[in-house]
Amino acid sequence: MKIKTLLLCFFTLIIFNCKNKNYQLSKIEGKQIEVTDSIKTNQSFDSIIKPYRDNLTKDMNAVLSFAPQTYSKTDGELNTAIGNLMADIVYDQGNIVFNKRTNKNIDAVLLNHGGIRSIISKGNITTETAFQVMPFENSIVVVALKGKQLDSMMDYLRHAKRAHPVSGMELKLDKNYNITKALVQGKTIDKNKTYYLATNDYLYDGGDRMRFFKPNDSVYYLNYKIRNAMIDYFKKTDTIRPKIDNRFTQTK
């Protein structure tokens, strides 16, 4: 009997000891580890990446064009020299690809003011300049829209009161931000006509509350990054000369 009792106690202890314990987190401690020059370089690892780093540095520092002055997106009110440059690059470079694929032409371009992330400094324009101005992977998209949807776009622009880059169009506002002139390719917008508007994939998907791109007649993904379009443009342009003009203005 004693043996049975001892065995029962033994197995009872085993069962209770095998139960899962519920551990609870009681404290989290953090420690800041600074990355400084005092950290020694791993020479074996560095020797592997050095050729790639040197190659990348060479490519990024390659001189593509020249800027006779510094261009900033804060320089104008409703249109800026750098914004006009960006929109015109998308218009010119994007149309080369679009026309080749569809035998059609881009009518106008709309980008966003916030998409310009850096100034273009006076002096040499390098590949790195393009990455600084346009660090995002945004690609050019061409959307087929009826004229009545362009009216919605113009209405968006007058309410936004920002220098969103445009090309191929002219928008004029009075002192109360009412539209007094809205032209595409120098002509009044035909509500029933199909226009081909170039933008980027972020805006096409509703970025910056630009919801007038959908629905549409059709959409064309060019698979051509805006940054690459900039690089291609800079390569064939010795000196850039963008300026503020009358494409988007307000009568005071």
Predicted segment positions?
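Sec-dependent signal peptide recognition
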Residues: 2-9
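Post-signal-peptide N-terminal segment of Sec-exported extracytoplasmic proteins
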Residues: 39-64
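Acidic/histidine-rich, surface-exposed loop or edge segments in extracytoplasmic proteins
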Residues: 59-77, 210-214
